[in-house]
Amino acid sequence: MWPPRFPPPRPGMSEETRQSKLAAAKKKLREYQQKNSPGVPAGAKKKKKIKNGHSPERPTASDCQSPENVPTDHIAPAPPTAATDTMFLGVTPSPDADLTQSHDAGNCSNLMEETKTFSSTESLRQLSQQLNGLVSESTSYINGEGLTSSNMKELENRYQELAVALDSSYVTNKQLSSTIEELKQQNQDTLDQLEKEKKDYQQKLAKEQGSLREQLQVHIQTIGILVSEKAELQTALAHTQQAARQKAGESEDLASRLQSSRQRVGELERTLSTVSTQQKQADRYNKDLTKERDALKLELYKNSKSNEDLRQQNSELEEKLRVLVAEKAAAQLGVEELQKKLEMSELLLQQFSSQSSAAGGNEQLQHAMEERAQLETHVSQLMESLKQLQVERDQYAENLKGESAMWQQRVQQMAEQVHTLKEEKEHRERQVQELETSLAALRSQMEEPPPPEPPAGPSEAEEQLQGEVEQLHKELERLTGQLRAQVQDNESLSHLNREQEGRLLELEREAQRWSEQAEERKQILESMQSDRTTISRALSQNRELKEQLAELQNGFVRLTNENMEITSALQSEQHVKKELARKLGELQERLGELKETVELKSQEAQGLQEQRDQCLSHLQQYAAAYQQHLAAYEQLTSEKEAIHKQLLLQTQLMDQLQHEEVQGKMAAELARQELQEAQERLKATSQENQQLQAQLSLLVLPGEGDVDQEEEDEEVPQSSLAIPEDLDSREAMVAFFNAAIARAEEEQARLRVQLKEQKARCRSLSHLAAPVQSKLEKEAVVPRNVDDSASEESNQALHVAMEKLQSRFLEVMQEKVELKERVEELEHCCIQLSGETDTIGEYIALYQNQRAVLKARHLEKEEYISRLAQDKEEMKVKLLELQELVLRLVNERNEWQGKFLAVSQNPGDVLTPVPTGSQEFGAADQQDDLREVSLADDIEPAQGEAGVPAPHENPTAQQIMQLLREIQNPRERPGLGSNPCIPFFYRADENDEVKIMVV
């Protein structure tokens, strides 16, 4: 309350009344100061704040005028109470000044309030000065000094002014106190909000860090699973590559066998040398194909020249044949002369021999004439066959030219494919490098530490970056797979190119051999010409003429044999080329199938990864609700260990199967080695047969020995066994060995026929020797006549012939004995060969049985793996259904829980008792603890009579239990283990109930 105005003191007023009034005024002033004391220091603090904010300096209540600043006419010692009161007005501190200072530091709207507080303090200062003056006047009045009326008026005016100033200051103080209280309240509210925001922010940070850690763990697990799957795929690829390499090794073996068979090819290899050189140059120099074409054209031109030379040689041979025919006519003349001489000799010998001997000589002459006629017809047939062979040779040359053009086109196509593959490989490598750089940049960004106070927004950006990183990982894996496939294709192409280089080198070597043989043939032709000149000089001898005809016949036989060999070699080469093309096509198809399987597996891996991502997203959503489900997690770990044991058992079974496969392969290799040994034995026996045939050829008569020797030399290579390269089945091997045995038997029969012929020749020689010997005996009895000289010469000739016949007869008999011994040895060798073929057939049967067993095991393994994959897919489908049902059941439970909470919040509206399940929920909410909720129960607050329904009344719970029973008891799936896979956030207990921890 503001003190009332007092009238001015009168001059005659007593000192006691004045002192009492002053004391009352001081008391009221103190009360007023005590009431308004909280508001005054605020202004002082604000002024101090303005000084700290570089505002212009203003006087405060603490800087009020001291008693020395009062005018001299008012100077008087003031009482201590007034001085202390004035100091209290300007110096009293406030406890909330710091809060207001911290809260209003940057607000420009409080400047007007500060000016108001400044004016109130100024008015208080003036009031204190007036009080000091009044006190000084009172003291002066007490001391005996009189007051004038003017002073009294001034005092009254001052008093009125002070009253007005006090009223205004009171109003302003009230306003300031209200504003201060409002500011305090605002400051307190802002502090509370800041604390709440800090707590919320810390909680959000903790939740986000937990979720990010869980996501990182999940990503680490998925990466580990993907790495394991990648390792499995790599092992599968390694197995397929090993199988492909084995097939390539088999193809190399086949190629080596083909190369051994090609050594006997003659003119075919000469024409194929162009193709081989082109292939070799294409493999070595992929860019110099045009130069190689020119070289091949030159070689073709040379070959055409060589063909023309051969034609010229054939024409020369024809001319020589004509000369031989002329020589034959001359020989016939000589024979006629000899016949005349023989007739003369017969006339002379008629005296010493009987008519029977003369008749035998005539028969011999007739037989010689018939042989000459037969030889002439045979020569004409040889000429016709030579012409036919020339025509066939021209046809073969044309066919080889067409094949060479086809091979040139194929080589060009292969070079283009290699170039395109190199370009694709470089492009893929660039893409991989770019992806690696982008991955490194993303990893560096991910490894950078997050800011201390990240906002709530960047989580989405991080998720986007993670998605991009996963996509880049997928692209990188896909590109690496493509790059590996490209590398494998390049390796296969390089391997094929190397094989073709080896073949071309062998063909070149054979061409060189053929050129050397051509030179040798030229030399042989020259020697033949020289021999024929010598033969033309000795036309008188029938024996030499027979040898020439035999040589011609041998040449014809050689040509026919070479023709047959060339045709057979061509057919075999064509067949081999077809088989190689078919095998190449099969290998390419297998490679394509492997690529498709790899792509399918990669797609399946991507699908599984997407499913895992979906499952992980669901798990992250429910991870906060099921964190403390430790018992179920331990059970799941035990199940995981059991599954791991099952997987180990399966891997052991797979290792056993692989070991058995390796054993089967070793057995197959042993059988193959035994086959090779048998083939070597067959070759040795064939060589022995050749040696025997050569020895037999030495036993032929001197007149016909060369002919038979050359025939046997031509028959030996025909009887040599050519082991085929495609003996895969048992039937083929048995047929091959039966054919070999039949061929050996044929050779044995042929040798027996030769023995019979030798016997017949020996008999004929004995018959020829008998009349000559009788003639000699008769000559010894008959006396010599006038023609002693002629008879002596004829007797000497006959004696020499007899000696030769006797020596030849003895040699033939010895050779006959040796031939019998050799025939017995050959029969023994044939018996051994038949026994060895039987053992080889048994080995082949064992190999086929082992191969069938391995195939059956492999099929069983594939069926088991397919069954496991099918069970895995079915288990995935069931788990997805189970997850959907659990989510549906959880949603229903949440709905019923919400309904129950609504009912529990309004207990007055519900008359029925609350079921036990709802009481448990209320207790859980009050205690803020975790509680186990059975999914088999379905809490449902009923309207009317409340009760807990049975588990079988809820269809979702029934479906969940049915799926869990199917998963735990897979009776229809023998391939799966006894412990099924169940996600870790739920599991059935002994009562077939799923318990979930609810927060």
Swiss-Prot record:
Chief location of this protein within or outside the cell? Golgi
Task: Give a brief account of the tissues where this protein occurs.
Answer: Widely expressed. Detected in brain, kidney, lung, liver, spleen, heart, skeletal muscle, thymus and pancreas. Detected in spermatocytes. Present in oocytes during all oocyte meiotic maturation (at protein level).
Which residue stretches, if any, does this entry annotate as coiled coil?
Answer: 147-895
The membrane topology noted for this protein in its Swiss-Prot or TrEMBL record is:
Peripheral membrane protein
Q: Name one GO biological process term.
A: positive regulation of axonogenesis
Q: Where does the record place Polar residues bias?
A: 271-280
What's the protein here called?
Golgin subfamily A member 2
- Any matching Pfam family: GOLGA2L5
Q: What is known of its domains?
A: Extended rod-like protein with long coiled-coil domains. The nuclear localization signal (cNLS) mediates interaction with importin-alpha, recruiting importin-alpha to the Golgi membrane and liberating TPX2.
Fill in the PTM field for this protein: Phosphorylated at Ser-37 by CDK1 at the onset of mitosis, inhibiting the interaction with p115/USO1 and triggering Golgi disassembly. A report however suggests that Golgi disassembly is independent of phosphorylation at Ser-37. Phosphorylated at Ser-37 in prophase as the Golgi complex starts to break down, and remains phosphorylated during further breakdown and partitioning of the Golgi fragments in metaphase and anaphase. In telophase, GM130 is dephosphorylated by PP2A as the Golgi fragments start to reassemble.
Chain residue ranges for the region called Interaction with p115/USO1: 1-86
Tell me what organism the protein belongs to: Mus musculus (Mouse)
